[in-house]
């Protein structure tokens, strides 16, 4: 049994049912979680797919080697709603993906200023993808409206 499950069980046995009394409350002002023991073949997209089950992710930072660009096996993910972090920590800690048991926990992560260029590049690419997707959908709809 992992530590997080033990803490949750202890809270239940003690009758702690209020979110304000829970150990999760310490992280109430931070919507980031730490994701460790990742299979190094997983991408940001894979992480978003899995973790979107518990809320809307708004940021994911997959740690990569500066020289090779290869994953270092851990990431930070931010949810739109901090309460989603509780669901992810409680439900995905120990969950196996790619043959590895994930280590999920709350964190006080703060993005580094040096990542600003990275964020801007990712946002630019996502914006292009959204525009491309919207344009593709418009083209498909326009094509459907045309007579054969």
UniProtKB/Swiss-Prot annotation:
This is U2 snRNP component IST3. Belongs to the IST3 family. GO terms for cellular component: cytoplasm; nucleus; precatalytic spliceosome; Prp19 complex; RES complex; spliceosomal complex; U2 snRNP. It comes from Saccharomyces cerevisiae (strain ATCC 204508 / S288c) (Baker's yeast). Component of the 45S U1.U2.U4/U6.U5 penta-snRNP particle, a subcomplex of the spliceosome. Belongs to the CWC complex (or CEF1-associated complex), a spliceosome sub-complex reminiscent of a late-stage spliceosome composed of the U2, U5 and U6 snRNAs and at least BUD13, BUD31, BRR2, CDC40, CEF1, CLF1, CUS1, CWC2, CWC15, CWC21, CWC22, CWC23, CWC24, CWC25, CWC27, ECM2, HSH155, IST3, ISY1, LEA1, MSL1, NTC20, PRP8, PRP9, PRP11, PRP19, PRP21, PRP22, PRP45, PRP46, SLU7, SMB1, SMD1, SMD2, SMD3, SMX2, SMX3, SNT309, SNU114, SPP2, SYF1, SYF2, RSE1 and YJU2. Gene3D superfamilies: 3.30.70.330. GO terms for biological process: generation of catalytic spliceosome for first transesterification step; maintenance of RNA location; mRNA export from nucleus; mRNA splicing, via spliceosome; spliceosomal complex assembly; U2-type prespliceosome assembly. The keyword Protein biosynthesis does not apply. One of its GO terms (molecular function) is RNA binding. It comes from the Eukaryota. Disruption phenotype: Cells have a slow growth phenotype that is exacerbated at 37 degrees Celsius. Deletion mutants have a significant pre-mRNA leakage at 25 degrees Celsius.
